Amino acid sequence: GLQGMLDIGGKIWIYYEGDIPVCSIMFIPSGEDAKNDLEIEGIDYNLMGDIGPVFVNFDYLGHGLMYQMLQKFDEYLESIGYKYVMTTVHPDNIFSSRNMVKNGMKKVSQKVFKRGLRDIYFKELD
């Protein structure tokens, strides 16, 4: 659960405008468990961060907030020595998929998870 993710070093960023939560993003350290999902050889899965749930307030859609959060997410991962980032996106979620691609991620596969079908995106950080 959430506490378990925080206990292993996960973080949640929530951005506000005044008292209104505008957007949020979650970092989950991937670890060796991600090997089964990603199936990419030759990378250190302990140096990979997973983009967890992302939220953008409906009233703030279309302002580039997700893309800005993804950039900050990458900066954070680089600052703690991580080399890779991955995430999963529902195939019907065109907006998130476009933001992942805009942020330099590539769709590497598609799998069925507990929450249903997901596209898997991955990139190596600079």
Stretches with model-predicted labels:
Residues 51-62, 89-90:
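A short, internal acetyl-CoA/4′-phosphopantetheine-binding micro-motif in the GNAT/acyltransferase core
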